[in-house]
Amino acid sequence: MAISAIPIEAGVDSAKEELVIQSAPDTKPFAIPNTRKAIKAWLKTLPKGSALAIEATSTYHMEMAEQAHAAGFVVYVVDGLRLSKYRESIALRAKTDAHDAALLARYLSKERSSLKAWTPPPAGHRKIQVLLRRRAKLVEVRSMLRMSWSGDKLFAPQFKRMDKALKQAELALEKRLREVVKEAGLEDQLRRVQQLPGIGFLTAVGLVMSFMRGEFADSDAFVAYLGMDITVAQSGKWAGRGKLSKRGDSEVRRLLYNASMSGSRTETWKQFYAHHMKRGKKTTQALVILARRLARLAYGLMRHQADWRPEIYVGGPPLHN
């Protein structure tokens, strides 16, 4: 593959086994194995000053992103939701790996000035993210198995052993999470966040992991990073219903929502939750509002490295959700 002297803007669709790449508008997309060796070889063919738009897919995009950044290229990681909305905006119906690679290249070419370049996460971030996701998948599988096998008496002993093994694996993952948090020097931040009523170990880990990933101007930016901000479609006098943007890590959002359910039953948040229910909010809406409040408070504690002081919270109507 000949090396051009002109920098390119490439799109990279990532999957577990391979990467599909659109390296220039007038070329056909091609695939390479998603391995360290193959990625390193391809990056050597790129001209200096080139940029890559890579779709965030679980953790399958990380090897390419890290190697490309280390090699001096500008990397933009695009989440799937944003890419989907861009596809709709240009009325593109086809969706294959090749089409996605071309779409990423086009998106980078047209929108680059408004995009923020990707930088590697701090030490421990990737390990924490992987462990949280693996635990979530394990819990999901265990729950599904318990539901589907609940009435089966014939294989009850076998299922009991399997369920016990899965629970042990879950506990092992949580133990490793604690070790990684300690190795990354995040114990103090974790302790601060866990002081919030309703916030347990796993939710605190997710919030600390999110906070360490970027520099946030304020709590609004942190809430938006978590995908807990509200977006509203509007045209003229018409306005649609507000919906969560759902950017960012879905597992952290799930943990935060679960924390709000737990928190709504505490003395600290009972009045807050009841206030929004009396205003006519549905249960889910009230819990999301509480989840956002928890996220904002966690942000404040981490940013100022302060401990939670319950006496400063007066309850009732929130000044800022």
Residue positions per predicted region:
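Long, charge-rich intrinsically disordered scaffolds of nucleic-acid metabolism proteins
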Residues: 2, 76-196, 205
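Gly/Thr-rich phosphate-binding beta-strand-loop-beta motif of the actin/hexokinase/Hsp70
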Residues: 2-24, 104, 205-206
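Nucleic-acid-processing active sites and adjacent nucleic-acid-binding tracks
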Residues: 25-54
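Acidic, metal-coordinating catalytic cores used for nucleic-acid/nucleotide bond scission
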Residues: 53-64
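Short, solvent-exposed helix-loop connector elements
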Residues: 90, 116-129, 151, 240-244, ...
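Phosphate-backbone recognition surface of nucleic-acid-processing proteins
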Residues: 201, 206-283, 319-321
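Acidic, carboxylate-rich catalytic segments that either coordinate divalent cations
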Residues: 267-321
